[in-house]
Amino acid sequence: MTNDADVALGIEAARRLAHLGLVDIQPGLTDAEFATIERRFGFEFADDHRAFLAAGLPVWTPGQDDHPDKASWGWPNWRQLDSSSTLHEQVDWPLATALDEIQHGEWPPGWSRRPHDLARRMAKAKRLLADVPRMVPVYGHRYLPAGRGSSGHPVLSIHRLTDTIVYGNDLAHYIDQEFREPRVTVPLWRDYV
């Protein structure tokens, strides 16, 4: 069951993004589109993420998405399910990078003992990862966990399994962190920021 506060958080994030005027925003996703996406990828959007995408589908940030160091993949265009290998790469990235690092020796601390045999290690990792919530792309390498009936999770920047940081306390805070330029008030120094 969806909570009004969860929906409000997603709508507030969408409002903040639209207010900045930096992004091409298409009409929001419909219930039928959500159902198709969720069936295709095997996850359900968290309630705040769903409300955000229902309010409007951000698809491009001129200037920001043109620079590979800033966004890499940019906004996922959930309407290009068949024509975009980029969307599939973006959705698959968290699991792919986790498995890649595990193959090269990394082992999450909470996962008991690491098998020495590579085949056993990878099989065990795949079993354990199957129980971890899927991460759903928000923008570039920024992700929220999947899960209908959940909301308010921190947005994570996932470049690698071992290079994961919190990029926003929640979706609305993330929009401010990623796209709103802070106003520097210190004389002299503000001219050099």
What kind of feature is each model-predicted range?
Residues 1-130, 136, 140:
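A surface-exposed partner-binding patch
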Residues 51-53, 146, 164:
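Residues in flexible loops and secondary-structure boundaries
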Residues 58, 147-149:
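Short, solvent-exposed polar/charged micro-motifs at secondary-structure junctions
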Residues 140, 145-147:
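Acidic, serine/threonine- and proline-rich low-complexity regulatory tracts
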Residues 149-193:
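Glycine-rich, aromatic-bearing surface loops/beta-hairpins
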